[in-house]
């Protein structure tokens, strides 16, 4: 093994150096303080859990993303957490057992076996919130507002909010009574926005002419808020669940606008991200210059059923590393340089400055690196028996 081999990191595993690490930590504190002010309690899930609980109710996507290992004590299979949300759902259902709404937040690093197709990293630092125990639209509105407020705290300027609702597609497909094979083919075609394939599949497999028109129109219903008016016309004879979903999306759009949140709303009624996992509205927030969503979330009711308590739930997550890149942070230069000296009063002066929040770096005997290299812009200087802070010459 060469020296170069010893410092190589696995693909997608990264280290965070100054000043980016400082920026991440400042942002972590700011976001968790924000969530606390909204009433969200911090939880810290384990890094590794048994696969039985870690992958419950999440479908195959998370299974493929999970690093797996054998527990040397029990012989059971374990997995490194690739997504915090299922863990927090378990904590709500089994560990906390609160009867009313439970607001929980978290910030922890997860590991993924494969890199996200939009991001190279396999060890994102996931920060977010989950609201359990309330099935109403007010809970969805709250988490969307909190996600947008968090992006503002992170320094995001222009934000594009993409809204969708899993219930629309689910209700139409249920009414069409498609076979499992036909539904899978239709799902994949809609995900690709392959209009011609959708048209052909629906014309072949759906007998109701009204449902044919609705399913063929579904992937074409995307754009600004005017899409909702178009959808009400297209889905005039649709199952009641479709109109209920449109009403929810209308209310979400209104909530974003009425609260003067800086976000341009975009709708995609065929957004099927997390179809096996989400049960209602889904959203993603984008910022110009970034190809991937900075915040993703939605409603995922009944995830806790496998743990003995089916609870309505909604929430979102963000990658702290990605958020920290919104504002370029140069090396900080705000320290106070203290000499390597034993003169009276120096230690007390340093202690007072540090207690007041100042960054004080004391030279070590024989040190050749000066205050500029240590990113200091001031220095402690003795004058007439007193230590004073003065600008560096």
Swiss-Prot record:
The keyword Cytoplasm applies. Its main location: cytoplasm. InterPro entries: aa-tRNA-synth_II/BPL/LPL, HisRS-like_core, HisRS/HisZ, HisZ. It is found in: Cytoplasm. Keywords: Amino-acid biosynthesis, Cytoplasm, Histidine biosynthesis. Pathway: Amino-acid biosynthesis; L-histidine biosynthesis; L-histidine from 5-phospho-alpha-D-ribose 1-diphosphate: step 1/9. GO terms for cellular component: cytoplasm. SUPFAM superfamilies: Class II aaRS and biotin synthetases. It comes from the Bacteria. One of its GO terms (biological process) is L-histidine biosynthetic process. Pfam families: tRNA-synt_His. Belongs to the class-II aminoacyl-tRNA synthetase family. HisZ subfamily. Required for the first step of histidine biosynthesis. May allow the feedback regulation of ATP phosphoribosyltransferase activity by histidine. Heteromultimer composed of HisG and HisZ subunits. This function is generally fulfilled by the C-terminal part of HisG, which is missing in some bacteria such as this one. This is ATP phosphoribosyltransferase regulatory subunit. It comes from Chromohalobacter salexigens (strain ATCC BAA-138 / DSM 3043 / CIP 106854 / NCIMB 13768 / 1H11). The lineage of its organism: Bacteria, Pseudomonadati, Pseudomonadota, Gammaproteobacteria, Oceanospirillales.
């Amino acid at each position: 093994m060469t020296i170069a081999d010893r410092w190589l990191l696995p693909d997608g595993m990264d280290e965070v150096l100054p000043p980016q690490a400082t920026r991440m930590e400042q942002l972590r504190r700011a976001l968790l303080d924000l969530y606390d002010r909204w009433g969200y309690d911090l939880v810290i899930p384990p890094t590794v859990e048994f696969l039985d609980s870690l992958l419950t109710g999440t479908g195959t996507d998370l299974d493929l993303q999970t690093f797996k290992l054998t527990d040397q004590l029990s012989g059971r299979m374990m997995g490194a957490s690739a997504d915090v949300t299922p863990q927090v759902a378990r904590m709500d259902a089994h560990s906390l057992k609160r009867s009313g709404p439970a607001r929980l937040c978290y910030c922890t690093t997860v590991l993924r076996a494969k890199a996200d197709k939009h991001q190279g990293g396999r060890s994102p630092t996931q920060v977010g919130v989950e609201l359990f125990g309330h099935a109403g639209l007010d809970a969805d509105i709250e988490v969307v507002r909190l996600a947008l407020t968090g992006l503002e705290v992170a320094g995001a300027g222009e934000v594009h909010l993409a809204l969708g609702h899993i219930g629309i597609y689910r209700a139409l497909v249920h009414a069409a009574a498609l076979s499992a094979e036909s539904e899978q083919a239709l799902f994949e075609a809609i995900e690709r926005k392959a209009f011609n394939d959708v048209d052909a599949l629906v014309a072949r497999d759906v007998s109701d002419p009204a449902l044919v028109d609705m399913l063929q129109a579904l992937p074409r219903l995307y754009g600004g808020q005017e899409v909702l008016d178009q959808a009400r016309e297209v889905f005039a004879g649709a199952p009641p669940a479709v109109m209920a979903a449109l009403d929810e999306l209308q209310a979400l759009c209104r909530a974003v606008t009425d609260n003067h949140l800086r976000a341009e709303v975009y709708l995609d009624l065929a957004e099927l991200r997390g179809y096996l996992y989400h049960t209602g509205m889904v959203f993603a927030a984008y910022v110009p210059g970034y190809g991937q969503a900075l915040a993703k979330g939605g409603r995922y009711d009944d995830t806790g059923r496998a743990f003995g308590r089916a609870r309505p739930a909604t929430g979102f997550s963000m990658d702290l590393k990605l958020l920290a890149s919104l504002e370029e942070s140069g090396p900080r230069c705000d320290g106070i340089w203290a000499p390597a000296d034993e003169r009276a009063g120096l230690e007390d002066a340093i202690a007072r400055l540090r207690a007041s929040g100042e960054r004080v770096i004391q030279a070590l005997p024989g040190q050749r690196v000066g205050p500029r290299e240590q990113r200091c812009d001031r220095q402690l200087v003795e004058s007439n028996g007193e230590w004073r802070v003065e600008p560096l010459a």
